[in-house]
Amino acid sequence: MAQVKSLAQSLYPCSSQRLEHQMKLQILKNSSVTCNDGTPAGYYIKESRGSRRWLVFLEGGWYCFSKHTCDSRYESMRRLMSSSNWPPTRTGTGILSPQPEENPHWWNANTVFVPYCSSDVWSGSTPKTDQRGHQGALN
């Protein structure tokens, strides 16, 4: 693994500087972009100065489609419906890892991790409420 790290650092000019390993939370100020429970949405970012490559990762997490399924989801998977317990930083793993041994192709890219908290399969939402009282995605 030391050979991989040495090779990776020799190939990229930005590798000689100290790279930030933590992705920092950025909460969105646009009040119309929220999680299911009304908390603000956001993203984590790690900039790699000198790199022109970007990796944007949208977290998955399934969906809910009615008041009943959303209430059940909130009880069992609250982290996928709220930003209230998001930590201020995250360490990337796998393809988001800043370690060349773990991620030899993208370790020094600028990375963005977008947590999933809207239960809409990344399709957006509507301000209208359906006949059953459910506000959600236009599917």
From Swiss-Prot:
Q: Report the InterPro entries cross-referenced here.
A: PAE/NOTUM
Q: Name one GO molecular function term.
A: palmitoleyl hydrolase activity
* Signal peptide residues on this chain, from the entry's feature table: none
> One Pfam family of this protein, by short name?
PAE
Question: What's a BP term from Gene Ontology annotated to this protein?
Answer: protein depalmitoleylation
Q: Would you say which domain of life the source belongs to?
A: Eukaryota
Provide the function of this protein: Probable inactive palmitoleoyl-protein carboxylesterase.
Family as reported in the entry's similarity comment: Belongs to the pectinacetylesterase family. Notum subfamily.
Q: What is this protein called?
A: Inactive palmitoleoyl-protein carboxylesterase notum1b
Q: Which organism is it from?
A: Danio rerio
